[in-house]
Amino acid sequence: MAMLTIVVDAMGGDNAPACVVEGTVEALRESGNRFEILLIGQEDKVTPLLKEYESESLNMRFMHAPEVITMEDVPAIAVKSKQESSLVQGLKLCKAKEADAFVSAGNTGAMMAASLFVLGRLPGVQRPTIYAYFPRLGEGLTNIVDVGANVDCKPEHLVQFAEMLTIYQRYAASIDNPTVGLLNIGEEEGKGPEYLKQTWNLLKAAAEEKKINFIGNVEGHDILAGKASIVVCDGLVGNTILKFGESIPHFLGSLFKPALEKMVVSGKLDQSAAALAGQAFKQIFEPFDVETFGGVPFLGVDGISIVGHGRSSSRAIKNMIYMAEHMIEQRVNERIAAMLS
């Protein structure tokens, strides 16, 4: 089998290019150079970092891209006007089959627009989608789909999201029979607006065809409870849940720290106990840490395109690279196309 080539956007993210280069170097060294990295970005900013990390012995090439799509750029406009950007050029390499996957912690909207514009859709896919991880009670994670790529969804779109994410979970996440729940205002059949009733019927039909394991409606409190592996909703609802979830650790932390300090000052708690409590608090919220998985793929585009959080660290970049490798090896896109054809 030929060595895989993964393109990494050196200019993507708030901490680029330093954290991107560091994460790329870590991935290659940790993996024993089992794949090739094509790092793409502005030469004057990236090459000094490559020298700093003594990357000569690594399976890494560099390609200059003079333009950068920033977090402030309007996605659709930037993708069209900045054709020489690292983001667009990296995806074009994948389209031309000169690389197997593209990884970036850059502008999410631009990544979605460019992935669709450059790579196109897999056969049978009506709309590509993006999902998010949520912690859950017990083992595993809950995946919510869609979380912002599609805010105006038809029932058939929601069903395809469930089907594509089912394939991803089976082969990329090694979940044998992931359960699918439809987010609604009640768990009984017949609840919710008309488009959700129609979606329920289509999901049930997909389950009868053995495409998914549909368990019915789920409610908001079921997300963290882990009732379903996959929770399906439109992008407006999903993005709202995602942003709310991201705010939880910061909000509780802002309450916890002063309360802890007050207890120490009052003598109700000594410093060592406070330190242990702080460690416990940090451990509780580890499942909310986006660094663990690094990023998420756009499901339904004709190529592997993985986007990370704008604040991605070197650890997140490294894990995105591993995710790309695993998706390629498990032929996730081929399996999605086969299901939908």
Curated annotation (Swiss-Prot):
Localization annotation: Cytoplasm
GO MF annotation terms: phosphate:acyl-[acyl carrier protein] acyltransferase activity
UniProt key word Kinase: no
Keyword flag Lipid metabolism: yes
Keyword entries, A-Z: Cytoplasm, Lipid biosynthesis, Lipid metabolism, Phospholipid biosynthesis, Phospholipid metabolism, Transferase
Coiled coil regions, renumbered to chain: none
Catalytic reactions of this protein: a fatty acyl-[ACP] + phosphate = an acyl phosphate + holo-[ACP]
Pfam families hit by this protein: FA_synthesis
Pathway(s) it belongs to: Lipid metabolism; phospholipid metabolism
Main localization, broad class: cytoplasm
One BP annotation, GO: fatty acid biosynthetic process
EC number(s) given by UniProt: 2.3.1.274
Annotated Gene Ontology cellular component terms: cytoplasm
Family label: Belongs to the PlsX family.
PANTHER family from the UniProt entry: FATTY ACID/PHOSPHOLIPID SYNTHESIS PROTEIN PLSX, PHOSPHATE ACYLTRANSFERASE
HAMAP family noted in UniProt: PlsX
Subunit structure as annotated in this protein's UniProt entry: Homodimer. Probably interacts with PlsY.
Role noted for this protein: Catalyzes the reversible formation of acyl-phosphate (acyl-PO(4)) from acyl-[acyl-carrier-protein] (acyl-ACP). This enzyme utilizes acyl-ACP as fatty acyl donor, but not acyl-CoA.
Protein name: Phosphate acyltransferase
Organism of origin: Chlorobaculum parvum (strain DSM 263 / NCIMB 8327) (Chlorobium vibrioforme subsp. thiosulfatophilum)
